[in-house]
Amino acid sequence: MPDIDKHKLSLSFSRAAAQYDAIAGFQQQVAARLAQLLPAIPATCVLDGGCGTGTSSALLTRHWPDALLLACDLSPEMVRQAHARQLTAVCGDLEQLPFSKACFDVVWSSLVLQWCQPQLAYPELQRVLKHGGRLLFSTLTSGSLHELESTFGEIDRHRRVLPFASEQQVVDALYAAGFEHVQCQAERWVTQHADLKTLLTSIRGIGANQTGAARRPGMMGKTQWQAAQVRYENLRDADGMLPLTYSLLFVSAEKSRAQD
């Protein structure tokens, strides 16, 4: 995973915070799918890591109504949106969490860890979990956004999509961080869009434009933009829509019950 500029990432998501809920239908569907995998285990303290505006936190509260729910996000504006939902939320990076050791029974994170360095984030998540605690998250893996990568890559040769980890790399990194009983469920989701501009807005509009894939047309030149539109038109599906593929991975892992 490349070294992502977290300051730029935070600013990008902060700019998108006010409109995020209106655009992030895909992200909300992924969170709902992850919620279907929540374990029937007791929990007194739960963390929503990378909470965004806090919409996913309601899923956790519904599952563990008596638990203390804390949330964190890299973006100050996202945290403010979460506060408006009466959530206890703080600014925090999953690679350097502002919480003490072994304080959560469950850590949840939906579509956030693809932005993180696994060798930093996974040990941090393991650190803040209690022994026997559970980590549940969704992330993107290799093959995601391949239509964008091929379309734009053949035009200007610039990488416009993150080099997402493979499922095996995710599993290996979790075990290397000290997790046990790692279970994964891979799913391929395809979103449909009327045109390329709308497709890119589904990414850029939620702040996820640090991949480079959602750069504005004017930044790449009119001729290149028109060439990209022509190339992507060849991908229209049977419904007459432009597809965008997400290789999703839903993961559950456990921190060892043995004391350090």
From Swiss-Prot:
HAMAP family: BioC (MF_00835). Coiled coil: none annotated. It catalyses: malonyl-[ACP] + S-adenosyl-L-methionine = malonyl-[ACP] methyl ester + S-adenosyl-L-homocysteine. Belongs to the methyltransferase superfamily. One of its GO terms (biological process) is methylation. Pathway: Cofactor biosynthesis; biotin biosynthesis. It is an enzyme of class 2 (transferase). Gene3D superfamilies: Vaccinia Virus protein VP39 (3.40.50.150). This is Malonyl-[acyl-carrier protein] O-methyltransferase. Keywords: Biotin biosynthesis, Methyltransferase, S-adenosyl-L-methionine, Transferase. Converts the free carboxyl group of a malonyl-thioester to its methyl ester by transfer of a methyl group from S-adenosyl-L-methionine (SAM). It allows to synthesize pimeloyl-ACP via the fatty acid synthetic pathway.
